[in-house]
Amino acid sequence: MGEYIMEKNTIILGIETSCDETAVAVVKNGTEIIANVVASQIESHKRFGGVVPEIASRHHVEEITVVLEEALKEANITFDDIDAIAVTEGPGLVGALLIGVNAAKAVAFAHDIPLVGVHHIAGHIYANRLVKEVQFPLLSLVVSGGHTELVYMKEHGSFEVIGETRDDAAGEAYDKVARTLSMPYPGGPHIDRLAHEGKPTIDLPRAWLEPDSYDFSFSGLKSAVINTVHNAKQRGIEIAPEDLAASFQESVIDVLVTKASRAADAYNVKQVLLAGGVAANKGLRARLEAEFAQKENVELIIPPLSLCTDNAAMIAAAGTIAYEQGKRATLALNANPGLDIES
């Protein structure tokens, strides 16, 4: 009888500190979450109406060791069980990134564990692999506070940005519009909730740009909302905030979904993946589902809410691919706030 040899599992420890979440996770074989611990700082930044870099860094320093220990305990493993450490090296806030990178390097050095640097957006894309195995070619619609882009992938680890924002990211526009409507930070979830109570009765612009472009632009829309509110105040006219939220959200989603759908057809992809913090938006999820339900040959993958916002499981998932492809970082690894996903 032939001997049955079980392939060894690949256990990756992920570390994410690019913005205002301190996160550590353990992922098996790039697809299975063993532990996923996130310490959020939203309450600390709320009163400032946005993330304060210095406060974010200070919180990361306080939390990183605690979160790391908690993840190992939750996974019921020791450092000896870990094949590699994957850490977000960029993009993000440089001071915040440094805390995660230095923690990863310290653990890698102390326990002689291989180190892998991960691009934050690659992490968001690979969060989908924790839901379902990905199939190539694929298209990822990345929508977050700092990024709005369409990324085409022919194979693992290969990223081609075919469309990106020329000014504000969608998440940025959400936060600024929320502030105009006197809503707390982060604005996205509040606008989303309010939009479901209103009707899109206010005519707002949609930036389609050139006919063949997959790029985005949200600064004109953001300005139009601010001007609408300002003009209404000057004239003493009452605008229903829920209608303004619904109109703004419809304008954003129209452009995102239409361009993603067009790109999916043009590039003949097998799957479309939703990624990034704004992927938690109920309106966007519903419109994408309706759009891609009509396309028989394209599978839409939408991650659960817990994997949309920043977390370390997605970094471990992306890190697994990099590790299996033989990519390694040295202890000279540094935070790179302007890291390019195509490099």
From Swiss-Prot:
Bound cofactor: record note: Binds 1 Fe(2+) ion per subunit.
UniProt enzyme class: transferase
Keywords carried by this UniProt record: Acyltransferase, Cytoplasm, Iron, Metal-binding, Transferase, tRNA processing
Protein name as catalogued: tRNA N6-adenosine threonylcarbamoyltransferase
E.C. designation(s): 2.3.1.234
Function: Required for the formation of a threonylcarbamoyl group on adenosine at position 37 (t(6)A37) in tRNAs that read codons beginning with adenine. Is involved in the transfer of the threonylcarbamoyl moiety of threonylcarbamoyl-AMP (TC-AMP) to the N6 group of A37, together with TsaE and TsaB. TsaD likely plays a direct catalytic role in this reaction.
One function term, GO molecular function aspect: N(6)-L-threonylcarbamoyladenine synthase activity
GO terms (BP aspect): tRNA threonylcarbamoyladenosine modification
PANTHER family given in the database record: TRNA N6-ADENOSINE THREONYLCARBAMOYLTRANSFERASE (PTHR11735), TRNA N6-ADENOSINE THREONYLCARBAMOYLTRANSFERASE, MITOCHONDRIAL (PTHR11735:SF6)
Family: Belongs to the KAE1 / TsaD family.
Binding site for Fe cation: 120, 124, 310
GO cellular component: cytoplasm
Cofactor: Fe(2+)
Organism domain of life: Bacteria
Residues involved in substrate binding: 142-146, 175, 188, 192, 281
Originating organism: Bacillus thuringiensis subsp. konkukian (strain 97-27)
Subcellular location: Cytoplasm
Catalytic activity, reaction form: L-threonylcarbamoyladenylate + adenosine(37) in tRNA = N(6)-L-threonylcarbamoyladenosine(37) in tRNA + AMP + H(+)
